[in-house]
């Protein structure tokens, strides 16, 4: 079992192939990532989810920028992201980001509508600063993705890294800024077999507490709560309630 703690101490991670040799997207499009900022990403899967482990080397780890923010707000932080297209058709990416302060962001991206950050999936991640850089570990359940029912999967895949203090962005599969969009220039993930698209049902409970004070200095509180429901009707439509 993989524990999402950012330690990468499970032996199974060592058996996974390594994605490396990232290429700069901005500002010097096409330039190789410096050796002292090299990035290594591994992917594993089981019957329920896909797992991502990223080691982002940095020769000055004390300078890694991190800011605690709300969900879907990157703030002033280094970022790691994974882009997944379960149909490998260049049409729609599911993008998952973790910043160096351990914050999450996610969105659905299409060429037509751009990035939609109102979409929120349920997934796990952990970011840890180390003496060599920083680590991100992620567990993305299949319920957060779209993919075919084929026994052998071929997914579009890319990884993203931003080094905020240097204003530099890198991707694993080269994104030529003179050509199409991110969704049309992904790499390919093969080897995932015998998984089935699950029922896409998320239940998201929430609560809030309000404190009120009137002119007579009387203070009282109000507790509110509720439940958001997201249900995948089919590959194209999701019901939000």
Residue ranges: model-predicted function:
Residues 1-240:
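Structural preference for beta-rich elements and adjacent junctions enriched in aromatics
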């Amino acid at each position: 079992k993989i524990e999402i703690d950012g330690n990468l101490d499970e032996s199974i991670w060592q058996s996974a192939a390594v994605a490396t040799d990232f290429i700069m997207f901005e500002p010097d499009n096409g330039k190789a990532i410096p050796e002292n900022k090299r990035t290594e990403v591994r992917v594993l899967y089981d019957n329920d989810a896909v797992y991502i482990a990223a080691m982002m080397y940095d020769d000055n780890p004390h300078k890694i920028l991190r800011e605690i923010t709300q969900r879907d707000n990157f703030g002033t932080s280094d970022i790691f992201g994974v882009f997944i297209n379960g149909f490998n058709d260049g049409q729609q990416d599911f993008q998952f980001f973790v910043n160096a302060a351990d914050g999450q962001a996610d969105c659905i991206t299409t060429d037509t509508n751009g990035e939609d950050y109102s979409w929120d999936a349920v997934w796990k991640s952990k970011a840890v600063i180390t003496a060599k850089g920083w680590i991100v570990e992620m567990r993305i359940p299949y319920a957060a993705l779209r993919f075919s029912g084929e026994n052998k999967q071929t997914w579009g895949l890319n990884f993203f890294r931003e080094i905020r203090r240097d204003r530099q962005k890198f991707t694993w599969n080269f994104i030529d800024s003179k050509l199409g969009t991110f969704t049309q220039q992904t790499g390919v993930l093969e080897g995932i077999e015998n998984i089935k698209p699950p029922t896409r049902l998320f239940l998201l409970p929430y609560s809030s507490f309000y404190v009120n004070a009137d002119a007579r200095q009387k203070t009282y509180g109000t507790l509110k709560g509720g439940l958001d429901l997201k249900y995948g009707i089919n590959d194209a439509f999701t019901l939000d309630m």
